[in-house]
Amino acid sequence: MGAQQSDQTNQWFVKDGVLTSPASGVNLMTSDSFKDFKLHIEFKYPEHSNSGIYLRGRYEVQVEDSFGKEPSSVYLGGVYGFLTPNENMAKKPGEWQSYDITLVGRRVTVVANGKTIIHDQIIPGITGGALNSREAEPGPILLQGDHGPVEYRNITISTPAN
């Protein structure tokens, strides 16, 4: 992974297998591009923090302190501005959480903390802040680091089963 081009300092570091952004700064993205994939990722954030995972650099799955809130496309598990989870599975801040996200074409399934919250729905367009609008092309995984502290670990990307 590498820092996205920016005037800001790269604040990311790895310690004991945990990728950490201690404060707002640059986004981080893979050097490889992916078309159809399954992503497993675990994350933790402090109270009131906000991050996101951009699939192919174009579709943001929200990572935000949303414990106790009504489901929304702008809270944990939502595809920002487009798809609202059927349930809010957010844990309290400071607890490790997980996503298993499958993206095939523009169809996405999001499993948060072991429960499917978005099932095989079409993402209608790119999210604000996307790297580009070339939806038919492979793209990187981008971790948002410009909104607040966040930690990620146990990141795996595989080919989805048919």
Indicate residue ranges for each PLM-predicted region.
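Carbohydrate-interacting regions of secretory-pathway proteins
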Residues: 1-162
